[in-house]
Amino acid sequence: MMRQSVQTVLPESTGNNTLSLRDSVCRDLFQLFSSPHSPLPILLVSGMPEWQGHNQSDKLLQSWYCRQLRSALLFHEPRIAALQVNLKEAYCHELAISLEMMLYHDDEPLTFDLVWQKGSWHRTMPQ
């Protein structure tokens, strides 16, 4: 299996540079989830057919999903220093996740929320 690598130049953490780093990470994460050719495992990107066949309230399944997603995202996004993946909602046709992360060269946490609805991922605003 061939792995893709991403080379990233990290900006200094001053003013607009930090904001553009945060925007860039969010944009790249959304693109990673939205791309039909994403290097993320298929269940993590468009896995609702597989998700529907399981008990969505199964805590072991939810924990496995979060661990797999965390591992894949840390591998594909080198600007993330720390990451926590939380399942906010898990229903048959809808899945809501929250990514809470710390970026290198940024002192503030960043939250990125996604919802799987009607066959695709959508960004939501954190509450």
Curated annotation (Swiss-Prot):
GO cellular component, one term: cytoplasm
Principal place of residence: cytoplasm
Pfam families: GPW_gp25
GO biological process: cellular response to oxidative stress; DNA damage response
Compartment list: Cytoplasm
GO molecular function ontology, one term from the record: anti-sigma factor antagonist activity
Keywords: Cytoplasm, Stress response
Keyword Cytoplasm on entry: yes
HAMAP family listed in its UniProt record: IraD (MF_02010)
Assembly, per entry: Interacts with RssB.
Similarity field: Belongs to the GpW/Gp25 family. IraD subfamily.
Protein task: Inhibits RpoS proteolysis by regulating RssB activity, thereby increasing the stability of the sigma stress factor RpoS during oxidative stress. Its effect on RpoS stability is due to its interaction with RssB, which probably blocks the interaction of RssB with RpoS, and the consequent delivery of the RssB-RpoS complex to the ClpXP protein degradation pathway.
Protein name as it appears in the record: Anti-adapter protein IraD
